[in-house]
Amino acid sequence: MPMLKDPSQKYRPFAPIALRDRTWPDRVIDKAPLWLSTDLRDGNQSLIEPMDAAKKMRFFKTLVQVGLKEIEVGFPSASQTDFDFVRELIEGGHIPDDVTIQVLTQARDDLIERTFESLKGAKKAIVHYYNACAPSFRRIVFDQDKEGVKRIAVAAGRTIKRLAAAAPETRWGFEYSPEVFSSTESDFAVEVCNAVVEVFQPTPANRLILNLPATIECATPNHYADQIEWFCRHVDRRDSVIVSLHTHNDRGTGVAASELGLMAGADRVEGCLFGNGERTGNVDLVTLALNLYTQGVDPGLDFSDIDAVRKVVEECNQLPVHPRHPYVGDLVHTAFSGSHQDAIRKGFAQQDPEGVWEVPYLPIDPADIGRSYEAVIRVNSQSGKGGIAYLLEQEYGISLPRRMQIEFSQVVQKETDRLGLEMSAAQIHALLEAEYLRAETPYALKGHRLQEENGTCALDVEVFDKGESRHWRGIGKGPLEALVACLPVRVEIMDYHEHAIGAGSHARAAAYIELRLDGQRSLHGLGIDENLTTASIRALFSALNRALGQQASIRAA
């Protein structure tokens, strides 16, 4: 069935909230929210193959290592595997003193009782219960009116409160979710939540969590922010309530919705690492946290070795992280475009290690999350001189002069077009060697001897000319002038650069010569040797042979 020409026949737009005095657009997020990971519950239940106990334990320990202080560990009343895992966490002493586990239950007495059985002996625990409140769920799924939905929430709350009072050895926390909050009438969502608040009687010292899920993301992020601000204004005992967000990514804006929800007054965010979860996934806690970090706000979570975290998540979930996933994807710190590479290279050159991060195209320093700079610039047919120069400089210490960068980039471009593939730094270096360092036709340097006296240099060189050994001798003010004087062709040195590669006793010299032969366009040569004079002589021969090769090609054409 094709898409409709008039989708309004089938789909209804969301109804905007009348909130003309909204204040959230003028706010900024200047502190981290409370975080809850639901990887082991919402994330796990969405997997094709849910995690076994060993994977769950590995994931749990990773979450603790990252710094999560509240972790939803399962749905023990719905799964024996989850029940057993909760018991192992408690009985095995795996829960640090500063970490609180959370479990989910439906609003049914038998399931709530089973949930409390799973938590027996826990030092701290949050019991999270829910029931759906949206009109379509009331009508289609549960056949309940508003009063019926509210009665379910209140009755379940009373059961939870009673069972918690019977187990005073545990420090209890409570959370209620009006499921599908984002599609529920705002006044009714507040009405139900206020009835739950009345049951639990929270105080500023012992707050109740009211979690407001965008169970199915159905509107723009600003609409969700309006819902949150309206809720915060109208809920009872606001100072005794933690307003929690639980966004999904059905429209692709879960992160934005959570950020605007925090601006609208929420205190807490539930989500999964790298956005796992039902359908299109829960909000990605990593992206949210690192968005804060790159705004100068400490997120309270540690992703210093983000690839190690990713490895655990991928292996436990059996799902890959997308190469373009923010912050962690294989390609997110990579530039192929020539103009991007040039800007990044210049940014790195000017970046103060102790200063504000200002490298173009990189919103975060890859080193902060355990990434190297090796993959920042990669070369394909779209790349330019900046990226090529950066790779040679970073990997091999070779700093090509600017005009030589332009010249060599054309060589690389031709090769990438031929291959149709990306070129690695090693392949680029091999191409540089073939083009410049092994340019030994028609003249291959065999050896040289230099004598200096009274400011004059006498240079003797031995060369192979088409397989025959020849001796040339030249006089000049320096080695290069002496070499030019003895060449059998007329050349002009247009430019010269040199620098050291490495340091100490193992340092080598790199010399670059731009040379013009008989009025042709100039070409470059490169020489590398432990001795600077030898490197310079090699560079001149490199340029000369390339120029003679070009001349021969022109004549042949």
From Swiss-Prot:
The keyword ATP-binding does not apply. It is found in: Cytoplasm. GO terms for cellular component: cytoplasm. Residues 439-557 are annotated as: Regulatory domain. Mg(2+) binds at D42, H246, H248, N282. Its main location: cytoplasm. One of its GO terms (molecular function) is magnesium ion binding. Its cofactor is Mg(2+). Keywords: Amino-acid biosynthesis, Branched-chain amino acid biosynthesis, Cytoplasm, Leucine biosynthesis, Magnesium, Metal-binding, Transferase. HAMAP family: LeuA_type2. Belongs to the alpha-IPM synthase/homocitrate synthase family. LeuA type 2 subfamily. This is 2-isopropylmalate synthase. It comes from Azotobacter vinelandii (strain DJ / ATCC BAA-1303).
